[in-house]
């Protein structure tokens, strides 16, 4: 049985260190942080271990964006009026996600296994369907974002060996041009 009090207490302590206020809601699936608030779905006693791990990873990921070491990207995006739903903003967000995940897994080593589990789960659950099923959409923005997502898993695999298999399986669905992009990113860093 999940100790909800302990789970929420841990969430509140981590958020406070990052300067965030936690707001629990029933309908929010993943976390957002508009205006210094961490809005997160309230955990449920009916959740299984996998659901709790994904929730913990989402919470730690969003808090990670606000840790002092990586807090700079969101103010910059707002100042420059860069929308993360556009291709350029999405790519910047993916790059920052890598930086965020590496940093927060170093600051809070206990979050690393939830990150590995969640990455494997999301890829196998077709969270990004065009990556898992192959890139049927030939539009350049989608191809770039899909390649960046794949590359981000590859970068995380350097630190977490279990993700090597996930990266290899995701990479197989990319076309030759996308694979060349990945090879260039991995080679040139």
Language-model regions, residue ranges each:
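Short, functionally important secondary-structure microenvironments
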Residues: 1-189
């Amino acid at each position: 049985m999940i100790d909800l009090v302990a789970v929420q207490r841990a969430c509140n302590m981590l958020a406070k260190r990052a300067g965030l206020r936690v707001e629990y809601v029933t309908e929010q699936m993943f976390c957002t942080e508009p205006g210094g608030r961490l809005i997160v779905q309230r955990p449920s006693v009916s959740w299984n271990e996998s659901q709790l791990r994904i929730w913990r990873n989402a919470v730690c990921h969003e808090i990670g964006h606000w840790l002092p070491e990586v807090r700079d990207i969101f103010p910059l995006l707002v100042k420059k009026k860069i929308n993360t739903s556009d291709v350029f903003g999405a790519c910047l967000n993916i790059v920052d996600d890598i930086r965020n995940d590496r940093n927060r897994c170093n600051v809070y080593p206990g979050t690393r296994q939830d990150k590995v589990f969640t990455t494997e789960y999301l890829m196998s659950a077709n969270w990004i369907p065009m990556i898992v099923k192959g890139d049927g959409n030939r539009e350049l923005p989608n191809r770039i974002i899909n390649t960046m997502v794949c590359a981000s898993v590859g970068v995380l695999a350097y630190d977490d060996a279990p993700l090597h298999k996930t990266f290899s399986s995701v990479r197989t669905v990319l076309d030759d041009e996308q694979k060349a992009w990945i090879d260039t990113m991995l080679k040139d860093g």
